[in-house]
Each structure stands twice: as structure tokens, then as C-alpha cells.
Amino acid sequence: MADRGIFLYPFRRFQEWSRSTALIDWMESNNSHIFKINVPGYNKEDIKVQIEEGNVLSIRGEGIKEEKKENLVWHVAEREAFSGGGSEFLRRIELPENVKVDQVKAYVENGVLTVVVPKDTSSKSSKVRNVNITSKL
């Protein structure tokens, strides 16, 4: 059977570690990259957005663990089982080179974190460099 990973995950720019699901959409406009991440139940204080070395957008969520109360009989504990006792996630996305990492904005509304990464539209010198070829003849 062929490796279906290429077809299921065509963008190898994504890294994910989670005890819960943090679904993500990545859209691109003429002037920015827009990321929308599902973070239901998280407050802005529970979420950390960082730009790491190498233009990597890091989004981490750490939910509050519920305390076990004495004198309670648990009949179903799906939220605990699927989240490992707390809701945590980490998503890393390798950003393109032409972005303004110092102007990234993020906000949470109705359980969705939106991160806007502006593009750098200024013309830059080419990273292509000619190399002289010599002969030993």
C-alpha cells in the first residue's frame, strides 16, 4: 500500500503535538497569511503564540485541569480520557520567508484563534549568487 501521508498531509510545514485537537486552516491573501485554529474553551491567557527561530509560528494551548472531587462517582469521563487529564496542544508551522514576523497579530473570538502574519512585499536583493568556474588546464 502506498504512503497515503503525502495525500493526507501535503504541507510538511506543519508539526503537531497534542493531547487534544487543535484544527487549523491556513489562508493567504495578497498581503498576509491568515491562520484560524479551533480553541474552544480556551481563554487568551491559556494560549501562547510565538515566532521561533527559523520563521516557525508556534501555537501552544494549556487548558486547566479539572480537580477530581471526592464523594463523586464518575460514570463517563471522555473529556479526561481524550485530553490526558488536561487540554494541551502545540502546533508549529514553518512560515514562508517573505513575512513580517515583527508585525504578527493574534486574537481569540468564539473559540477560534486567528493569527495574521503580514507579507513583506518590499523587493529584496536576490539570494542567487553566481559562482565563477575556473579550470586547472
UniProtKB/Swiss-Prot annotation:
Assembly and binders: May form oligomeric structures.
Residue ranges of the motif Microbody targeting signal: 135-137
Keywords carried by this UniProt record: Peroxisome, Stress response
CDD domains recorded: ACD_ScHsp26_like
Family note: Belongs to the small heat shock protein (HSP20) family.
Any one GO cellular component localisation term in the record: peroxisomal matrix
Protein name: 15.7 kDa heat shock protein, peroxisomal
InterPro entries: A-crystallin/Hsp20_dom (IPR002068), CS_dom (IPR007052), HSP20-like_chaperone (IPR008978), Small_HSP (IPR031107)
Keyword Plastid tagged: no
Role summary: Possesses chaperone activity.
Pfam families in the record: HSP20 (PF00011)
Subcellular compartments: Peroxisome
GO biological process: cellular response to hypoxia; protein folding; response to heat; response to reactive oxygen species
Chain ranges of the sHSP domain: 15-134
Source organism, top-level taxon: Eukaryota
Stimuli inducing this protein: By heat shock and methyl viologen (paraquat).
Keyword Zinc among UniProt keywords: no
